[in-house]
C-alpha cells in the first residue's frame, strides 16, 4: 500500500523557505567572477567573489522598491535620495523619500496598504499592465520574499502627515500590530525598511554578512546610483556623487601594464537609457553590465545582446573600411577590448523568472549615432598592434597553406603548380644564373618555350600569369590569399612571407624575368609584379639590382624599300618616330608587335639568341617605397589624380630608353606606369567636347565610313569596326558598346546615334535585357549626321594607329553630346557621373551662349532629364536634384504607379516591392508595364504610409541625381569638374565656333578653287570655239603651251581637267551649262561670305531641333498610348498621400527661362513623419534570437532610399515566469496549486 504520509501541502511561506531557489535564486555561496569596486584603485576590477545569489536578491528587492518609487514620485512629491546602511552585524536599512505608500486601509482586505505590500504575498500596485510603466516589480513577491527570508523585518512609512510602524519576525509568520500616528504634515515623506537576513538559512557559518558580499552589495548600490544619477544614493551616509553616466563608465577604464590609460569611454545617453563602450588596452572575455529599470541582469538578456550587436555592427563597418586599404581585423577579438555597459529604462520589462537575472522582452535601445561610433572605433590605439598580429597570423597561415619558404623539388612542383615549366638544372653555374621567365598568358609562354635553346632551358624556367594580378600593397595578405597566381609564383621561387632576404642564393631562382606585351596592359602587369615584391620583400630588391628584370621585345619592325632584306627593329615608338623624322622620304613597310603573340618562333629565337641584350635590370632604392606607395596605396588618391592630370592621355607614349640596361623605379613609374593609367582612364572617361569614349568614337567613325543605309547584324558590324579602326580589345566589349549606343528607351540615350532593330533592351532592366548580338541589327540614326556634319570631317585631327589613319582624336558635334546623353565611368583614380539633360535644352543653352550669355549663367537653367520621362525633377534639401516618379493613392490601400525615376529599372522596383511584401507593407502587385512605359498597381497595408514623402521614400519613387564630373579637356588632360558643368559648355562652344570658322574658310577656298577651274575651262572652250585651236594638228605640248599662254589654272600640276574632256564638252549645250555652273558657284561664294560662323551654327541647330521635336512627339505619344486609361487606373484619391503640386523655381537671374523645356520644381518640405532616423545603430530590436542582421537596408533601385525591417520573434519564457505571470493575474487563487504545477 502506498505511503500517503509523504504527500504534503505547504503554506506559501513554508514553500519559499523550502524552495527559495525558485524565488530568489540559489542560496548556496558560489565563486562567481564579476566586477566589484576596488577603493584602493578607485576602479571597477574583475575578480572572483564568493556570492550568495539568494542573499543578493532579497537585498535587491528592497532596493528596487526604492527605485520604483522614483517613477511613482513623478506625479507626487519629488524623490531626492536613497540611503542604504549595512551594519557590521549584517543588518540592512534602506530609506528613501518621495511619494510614499498611502497609509490607509484597503476597503476590500481591511488592512493598511504598507502591511499588505510588505507582509502579504501577491500584493502589488503593478497588476494594471500600464504600457508606460517603467517599474521593476511585476509579480507581487518582491519585499515579501525579503521578509520571509529574514529573522526580523520592520518598516516605517511617513506619508502626508501620517506615520506607519510595523515589524515581522519568524520569517513573516509573526507580526506586531500596525501602529499609526499623526505627524507634522510638513515633514518629508519617508519609507524606511530595516531587516536582518537569516544568514544561517543562507549558509553563512558566522550568521553574519561576509566581506565579499559587502563588496558585491557595494557594487550593486553603485549600479543603482549610476542608473538614477539625479537621485542622491548614499551608502553608510557616503554619497556616490555620479553627476552623469560618464562618471560611472570611467570607473571601468583600467590602465595598461605600463600605466598607460585607454581612451575615454564612448557614452551615448538617450530618453530610454544609456549605453557605454569602455575600451581596454588588453583583450579579455566579453564583459557586459546590464541594468533595466534598476534591475541588474546578472545573466544578461536581450538588452545585452542588442548592445553587443551595436558594437559589433560598428566594428563590421570599421572592418569594411579597413579592408579597402588591405587591412584586416578580427571583429570578435577587437570586441574583447571593450566592456559594454547598458542601462535602460523600459516599459513593462519581462524577465525569465522572479529572480530577474535575465531580460527576455523586446527592448528599445538608445539610437547610437553611426558616424560618431565609427570614428571613435577607428581611433582605438590598440588597432595597429591588432592588425600587425593579424598580418603575422595570416602570413603564417599562408606559408603553411601555399607552402612558401620550402625548397620543393621539381617533382613536388609538378603536382603543385601545373603551369610551371621548371628549369632542368637544379643550380646555377658561374656563367648562367637560374632565371624564372614570367610571361603574360599562355601564348607568350609558348613563344618563350619554343624560342629557348636546350642549353638555356637548363637554367630558365617559364611560368605564365593568367588573369589579373591583385594589388597586395601594404602587405595585404588577405587579398594575397585570394590570388592563386601570386601564390604559385612565390612557391615556384621558394619565397617565405615575413622573411628578410639580402641574397637570392637560397631561392630556387636567382632572377625573375618579366616578359609581357608592349602595351598598357603589359605595363600594368609589370607594375603589379614589382609592387608585390617591393611590398613583401623590399630588401631582396634593394640588395640585388636586377633580381626583377624586364624582357624587351621590338614593338615595330620596318622593311626599307630598295635595300635588300634590311629590317630595322624598334623597341619603342619614340625611337621609331625619331627615325621617321630623320628619314622623311624613306619608303618602307611596317609591322607592329603590340602583343607577343605576333612574333614568330623564328623571331623569338632571335630575341633569346642574345637574351641579355634584350634585358633591362630593375634598380630599387629605399626611397622608391614612397613612390610605389603613391601609385598603389588606395589612400593616395589625390597624389594619383595630380600625377595623371599632368600627362596627356592622347599624345603620350612610353618614353623609356630601351637601349639602357638599367631601369629605375622613378623612370618606370613616370614613363611607363603612367601610360597604363592614362590609357585606362581614356577607356572609361569621356572627352568633354564630343562626350564619347574611344570605343564609342571608333564605332561612330566606322559607321560613318561605311556609307550604308542598310542595317547589319551587331555581331557582323563588330568585326568590320575592329578591322577598319584597329580595335584591339575583343569584339564582345565592342558589341556591348554598339548595343548601348542604339538604346533609346527612357533612361537610355536621349540621342541614340544608332538605330535599334530588334530587342536592344528596355526599361524592364535598363537595357540589360537585350538580345544576343547575333540576332539584332543596327545602322546610323538620322541624328548622326545632324550632330556630326560631313563638312566637318576633313577638319578633324585623326589618330595614326599602326600606320593607318583611323578615328579622330575627338569629334566636335553641333551640341555637347556629353550633356545630352550623360556619362558614367570608373577609371584609374578618377570616376565620372554626369546625368543626361534634354537635348532641346542643351540646344537652347548653346543658343544663349551664342547670344552672349556666359556658360556659368546658362548651366543654371539646365535640369537633368530623360526624354520620355513623365515624372518631375525636384530640388532637394541640399540643393541637389531629385528625380521623382509619379503615383496616385486611392482609398482601400490601392496605389497606382505611372512613372519611376529613369535610373530605376522596373525589375529593381519589383524586387524592392517584394521585400516590402515580406514585411507586410505591400500586399499585392499587378504590373502592366511595357518596354518604355510604367503602369503598376499596388495594394498597400492601410496606415503603413501616412504622407506623400513616406510613399516616395518607402516605394523608392525618388532618386537623388549625383553630378561628379571628370572629363578629358580639349588638350587631352584629365580635368575634374565636380558638379560644375559650365566648363563642358565652354570647351565645346570654343571648339565648335572655331570649327565653323575653319569650315567657312575652307568652304570658301574650295568654292573659289572650283570657280577658278570653271572659269579657266570656259576660257579654253571660248578660245577653241573662236577657232584658235586645231586639235587635229595639235600635240600635247602645244596644248599645254596654249593653256599657259591663256593663264589657266593648274590642277595637280597639269591641265587634264580641261584637256581630257570628251568632244561633247565643247557643244553649245555644255557651254551654257558651264556658264550656269559658274554663276551658281559665284552665288554660293557670295552667300557664304555673307554667312557668319554663328549663322552656320544656328542653321545646323534649327535642323536638329526640328527633327528632334518630331522624334520626341512620336515617342511620348507611343508611351501614353500604351498606358491604361484613367477610367481603369483612377478612383477617389487619399488627400494626405497626394503628391505636392508642381511649383517651379524662379529662373536664374537674367536667363530666358521660357526657352527651356524642363524646369525644376522647388524644394518641398516633407510633412511631419513618424519615421525614426536611419543614421543610428540601435532602436527597436527583437526579443529573441540574434539581432545582428536585423535592419539590413532594402535596396530597390540604385541610390534609392532604404528602410529598416525588424523581425519580431516569439520569446520562449521559462516555466517559472509563466507561473508567476499567471499567478499575478489571478492573485491568490492558484497559490495552493503551485507545487503541483511546478513539480
Swiss-Prot record:
Q: Which residues form the Topo IIA-type catalytic domain?
A: 685-1101
What does the entry's cofactor note say about binding and number?
Answer: Binds two Mg(2+) per subunit. The magnesium ions form salt bridges with both the protein and the DNA. Can also accept other divalent metal cations, such as Mn(2+) or Ca(2+).
- Per the UniProt entry, what is one GO biological process? DNA topological change
| This protein's record includes keyword Nucleotide-binding | yes
Q: What residues does ATP bind to?
A: 65, 96, 124-126, 137-144, 354-356
Its predominant location is: nucleus
Q: Which UniProt keywords apply?
A: ATP-binding, DNA-binding, Isomerase, Kinetoplast, Magnesium, Metal-binding, Mitochondrion, Nucleotide-binding, Nucleus, Topoisomerase
* Residue span(s) of domain Toprim: 434-548
Q: In this chain's numbering, which residues are marked as the site (Interaction with DNA)?
A: 468, 471, 640-641, 693, 733
Residues that hold Mg(2+) 2 according to the record: 517, 519
Q: Which sites bind Mg(2+) 1? A: 440, 517
Please indicate which residues carry the site annotation Transition state stabilizer: 774
Task: Cite a single GO MF annotation.
Answer: ATP binding
Q: What SMART domains does the database record attribute to this sequence?
A: TOP2c (SM00433), TOP4c (SM00434)
Could you tell me which residues belong to the region Interaction with DNA?
Answer: 956-965
Question: Where would you find this protein in the cell?
Answer: Nucleus; Mitochondrion matrix, Kinetoplast
Cofactor(s) listed in the protein's UniProt record:
Mg(2+); Mn(2+); Ca(2+)
Where do the catalytic residues lie? Answer: 775
What highest taxon heads this organism's lineage? Eukaryota
Query: What is annotated about its quaternary structure and interactions?
Result: Homodimer.
The family line of this record is: Belongs to the type II topoisomerase family.
- The name of this protein is DNA topoisomerase 2
Q: What is the lineage of its organism?
A: Eukaryota, Discoba, Euglenozoa, Kinetoplastea, Metakinetoplastina
